[in-house]
């Protein structure tokens, strides 16, 4: 009886990890489709969001196969999703600025990584520039960072719901 309950609990948590991983795979696939098929160049903030989503998916996938330390992996997915959400919020802020307050466009990221100090390139990634303020695509009036924020919030809710064992256990029944 107890073993069956524990098994149901683990299966439910593994399903949530797999769901989070699936969300992340879809988001990364859409990002690459937009870049290579639609011709949209990712700005520095978009790259940070991609990295956060990829790390979220990687943590969920490792947690799915590891079969232990579920709280640790759900905590990791929460932290990486919060990082992606924070980057998306900053990106949305830049997009909402009036044109006269938008920061100047900086050099290309490849140029920065080749010719500037790594700390300067990293700062540019996190702060963003004028390229990040341009809305190049939207669906239902929501721009790309808006959709990233929505999916990061969903991932955060899924992860946090599994951090409380009583809540997670009641979902598995």
Task: Specify the residue positions occupied by each region the protein language model found.
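Extracytosolic (periplasmic/ER-lumenal) interhelical loops and adjacent juxtamembrane/interface segments
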Residues: 96-140
């Amino acid at each position: 009886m107890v073993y069956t309950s524990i098994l149901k609990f683990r299966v439910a948590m593994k399903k949530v990890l797999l769901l989070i991983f699936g969300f992340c795979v879809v988001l990364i696939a859409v990002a690459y489709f937009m870049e290579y098929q639609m011709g949209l160049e990712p700005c520095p903030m978009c790259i940070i969001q991609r990295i956060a989503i990829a790390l979220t998916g990687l943590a969920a996938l490792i947690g799915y196969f590891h079969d232990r330390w579920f709280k640790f992996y759900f905590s990791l997915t929460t932290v990486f999703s919060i990082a992606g959400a924070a980057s998306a919020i900053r990106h949305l802020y830049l997009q909402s600025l009036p044109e006269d307050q938008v920061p100047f466009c900086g050099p290309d990221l490849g140029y920065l990584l080749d010719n500037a100090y790594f700390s300067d390139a990293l700062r540019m990634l996190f702060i963003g520039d004028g390229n990040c303020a341009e809305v190049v695509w939207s669906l239902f009036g929501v721009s790309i960072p808006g959709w990233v924020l929505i999916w990061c919030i969903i991932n955060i809710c899924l992860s946090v719901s599994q951090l409380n064992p009583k809540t997670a256990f009641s979902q598995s029944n």
